[in-house]
Structures are given as structure tokens and as C-alpha cells.
A protein has these predicted regions:
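C-terminal functional regions that serve as terminal interaction/effector modules
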Residues: 299-307, 325-442
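Accessory beta->alpha helical hairpin/"wing" motif in late/C-terminal subdomains of nucleic-acid enzymes
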Residues: 65-73, 145, 149, 154-209, ...
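Short acidic, hydrophobic short linear motifs in intrinsically disordered regions
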Residues: 18-39, 110-133, 227, 308-309, ...
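Positively charged, polyanion-binding regions of nucleic-acid-associated proteins
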Residues: 23, 92-113, 287-320
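Short, charged/polar micro-motifs that form catalytic or ligand-binding hotspots
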Residues: 34-38, 87-92, 103-111, 134-141, ...
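Eukaryotic partner-binding/assembly regions in large regulatory complexes
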Residues: 1-85, 162-177, 181-281
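Short amphipathic alpha-helical interaction segments
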Residues: 40-51, 135-153, 347-364
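Internal, well-ordered domain-core segments that constitute the primary functional module
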Residues: 101-178
């Protein structure tokens, strides 16, 4: 077999870089933070559009000044939250301001004063039947400013004179803004006109269309840290198990991802660690506490006889975390490490806050999850979507793979990757080194 030429290798590398950029940043502008890579997207626009449509069912729009990849959702409970530059997550009110501002911008003049934009947003809220307080409270102003700042980051607004941040000024500042209506119109990706309310929009946005299980599973593989089998319908599990090796090769070629295939599910690993906005291990109090917490949870709760049913094991995707155990372990960690590691005073004074934020991070990493109905049981599946595998084929039974009472937390299989131990080197006795152990059985 002939080896690929240097031209072919370079071409594949360029296309892979462009595809990875669009997955990480679905809106790329010619003068935005990724302007250097925008010509690369333009150069391979046709190939990228074809591949994204074929593989993930995503539409790619490439114009002279921007490129927009219209990604789909994954259904209830699977969204990626937006955050301010400080890392503070958007509140429902921030999302409401963002949606209202977008509704104004799609028909706004090319230039608008900040005060006029704010007035139009309040008018749009009235039209939508939403209650927007005009109390002048600083927190309300900062919330509005955060939503407008996101529109500036996306390129839908340009600060021609002044800053959108002046809306939060005590005296009420002014600014001249330039509106890019094309970008504003391209931001919303879901089927708004077909949806009856927010919940229906989330459900319809996740519909993979004619691609069915194939498209949904592929989207889940690239958009989430881990795909567990019980988070898939019977038809999706059947498709994944029969195609997982070929899919691993395809994702390696398209995006440079490496597949980790185990009995409990599949994870796509990015060797360059670029395609994720989550880091664990990480810096900061929450990341440190979460890493130590998950290690101790695994040591306490590791199930016996877990493994692959085909070789005599018992498929275990999640085990219940007893009520009170997380608080108990975090109290121990604060006592052992909190002051020595200079954890933030706010977390040391508020165990409940530390518990909530640590669980939130572990949940986003798919290492723990609140107990509740699953997609394998039909939760979040549109009524028109085919759930059963065809031809009566036998599919992995996941009915007892995750047991817990609704309202409790569940420790998930991938958490075992973060259970560390200390081993002593006998050769020179230089130091004790951390090691990984306890991988989920395959």
C-alpha cells in the first residue's frame, strides 16, 4: 500500500485543525479571537460542510466574514452552561436577557445607542410577558451587562464608542454600538418556529433527524466526556456496539481523537486536551477538592465483580452514594488539606457551597450524576423517535447497571480513572509516586 504524500498529510492536518476549531468554537469570525484560523476554515469550507453533515448532522455556514457551525443539543439535562469571564455560570436571568437582546438585534439598525438597546430589550420583555425589574439594582445591571458582553464576544455587537459594561455603571453610562445582524440571526440553532415552549425546544433540538441512532450517538461521543450505555436507547446501544471500532478510526482521522472502549461505554480522548472546557486535575479549591473527593468515593464504593457480562462479570455503570457520605468526606478533606493548601476562605466557611460546587464539577465530568430516569428508559426521547433495535437483535441489558433512589447521587464508572494510590519504589527508594489504578473493567 502506497504511503500518503506529504501534501496529503498536510491537507489532512489542515482540515483536522479547522474541524477541531469549529467544534470548540462554533462561531468563528474574521476579526475575532480566532481570526488567524478563519482563512483555514474558508479554504476547506466545502469539505468541512460535507463531513460535518455526514458525520454529525451539523450544518456549516461559511460567509465572507464569519463561519457558523449549527450544533444540536443532546436532550434534557445535557446542555453546556455559559459562563462569564470570571467563570461564574449564567443564571436563568442572564439567559433571558441574552435571548431578549438577540430578538432585538435581528431587526436593529446598523448602529444603536446602548440606552436605546436597553430600552428595546425591556420592551421586548413586556411583549414576551416577562417581568424585568427596572429597579436599578447593581446585580440587575451586571446581569444585563454580562449578556451584552457575550454578544460582543460573538461579534453580534461591536463597541464603536464606549463599552456595554457602562450599563452597569452607577450613573448609567452610554455607548455607541454597531450591530451585525447576520451574525445575530445565525446564533440561534434550534427549531424555534416549531417549538411550543422551552422544554419542547430542547427536545426538538436533539432530534437527529434521518440519521437516527447513528447521528445521535456520534454527537454524544464528541460532545460529552463519557457515553454510558444506559444513556442510550436500545437502538443506539445496538448501533454503538456494532460500529464502535470503525467509529474510533473515523474520529481519529477527522478530529484526532482516541477512543477508550469499555464495558460501561465509550469515551473519546483528546491527546492534545483542547476540545474540552473542563479540567480535572485542575487548579483552584473546587478542582482540588473534587479530585480528592472522587478518589475517596471510589475507595469506599468500588463494586465487587464488576466487569463485562460476556466474561462472567456484572455490568455496573453506577453505584449509589449513601446520603451524607459526600459531606463526611469533604469535612475530612477540609481538615486535612483545606488550610495547608490555602483553599478559598469562602469554601472553608461554607461546607454546603463546597459540596455543591464539587459535585457540579464531577457531574459535568460525568463522574457522578443525580439519580433519575435515563434515556434507556425513554427519558428525553421524542415520541416519534425509534427506540428499539431492529430485527429483534439482542442488545446489552442495562436495566440493573445503575441502581439508586431518585434524589440521591450516583458514582459513575469513569470515576475509577481518578482513584490514585501511592506505590513505593524499591530500587532507590527516592520517593513515593502517585499511580493510576482501578480502571473500569472492559
Amino acid at each position: 500500500m502506497a504511503l500518503p504524500s506529504s501534501h496529503d498529510v498536510a491537507l489532512a492536518a489542515e482540515r483536522r485543525s479547522a474541524a477541531r476549531l469549529l467544534l470548540r468554537h462554533p462561531l468563528v469570525t474574521a476579526d475575532g479571537p480566532h481570526a488567524d484560523a478563519f482563512p483555514l476554515v474558508r479554504r476547506h469550507a466545502d469539505w468541512l460542510a460535507q463531513r460535518f453533515q455526514q458525520v454529525l448532522g451539523y450544518r456549516l455556514l461559511v460567509e465572507a466574514t464569519y463561519a457558523r457551525l449549527f450544533k444540536a443539543g443532546l436532550g434534557p439535562g445535557s446542555g453546556h452552561r455559559m459562563e462569564r469571564s470570571t467563570g461564574t455560570p449564567f443564571t436563568p436571568r442572564t439567559y433571558a436577557y441574552l435571548a431578549l437582546a438577540l430578538s432585538v438585534l435581528v431587526t436593529a439598525p446598523e448602529q444603536v445607542l446602548l440606552s436605546q438597546l436597553v430600552a428595546d430589550v425591556r420592551a421586548a420583555a413586556v411583549d414576551a410577558g416577562l417581568s424585568i425589574e427596572d429597579s436599578g439594582r447593581p446585580v440587575e445591571k451586571r446581569t444585563l451587562a454580562a449578556a451584552l458582553r457575550r454578544l460582543v464576544d460573538w461579534g453580534a455587537l461591536t463597541e464603536t464608542d464606549g463599552s456595554v459594561g457602562s450599563v452597569a455603571a452607577e450613573a448609567g453610562g452610554e455607548a455607541l454600538l454597531t450591530v451585525n445582524r447576520e451574525i445575530a440571526r445565525s446564533i440561534v440553532a434550534g427549531p424555534l418556529t416549531q417549538s411550543t415552549d422551552g422544554a419542547d425546544l430542547v427536545l426538538r433540538s436533539a432530534d437527529p433527524g434521518f440519521g437516527g441512532p447513528r447521528t445521535y450517538v456520534r454527537r454524544r461521543l464528541v460532545e460529552t466526556p463519557v457515553v454510558y450505555l444506559d444513556e442510550l436507547t436500545e437502538a443506539e446501544r445496538d448501533w454503538l456496539r456494532t460500529r464502535q471500532r470503525r467509529e474510533a478510526e473515523a474520529f481519529s482521522e477527522l478530529l484526532g481523537l482516541e477512543a477508550e472502549i469499555r464495558a460501561e461505554g465509550v469515551a473519546m480522548i483528546d491527546p492534545d486536551d483542547e476540545l474540552t472546557d473542563l479540567r480535572l486535575p485542575g487548579t483552584g479549591t473546587v478542582a482540588q477538592a473534587a479530585l480528592l473527593l472522587v478518589d475517596r468515593l471510589v475507595r469506599r464504593l468500588r463494586p465487587d465483580e464488576a466487569g463485562h457480562p460476556a466474561v462472567g462479570g456484572r455490568l455496573t455503570i453506577g453505584v449509589p452514594i449513601p446520603p451524607g457520605l459526600v459531606a463526611e468526606l469533604l469535612d475530612e478533606l477540609v481538615e486535612e488539606y483545606g488550610r495547608r493548601a490555602n483553599w478559598q476562605r469562602g469554601y472553608l466557611d461554607s461546607p454546603a457551597l463546597l459540596r455543591a460546587d464539587a459535585l457540579e464539577l464531577l457531574s459535568r465530568m460525568r463522574l457522578v450524576a443525580p439519580a433519575g430516569p435515563l434515556r434507556a428508559d425513554g427519558h428525553g426521547v421524542p415520541p416519534w423517535y425509534e427506540r428499539a433495535a431492529g430485527d429483534g437483535r439482542a442488545v446489552t441489558d442495562v436495566s440493573a447497571a445503575r441502581t439508586a433512589v431518585v434524589g440521591e447521587w450516583v458514582l459513575l464508572a469513569a470515576a475509577a480513572r481518578y482513584a490514585t494510590t501511592v506505590s513505593l519504589k524499591h530500587a532507590d527508594q527516592r520517593a513515593a509516586q502517585p499511580d493510576r489504578q482501578g480502571e473500569p473493567s472492559s
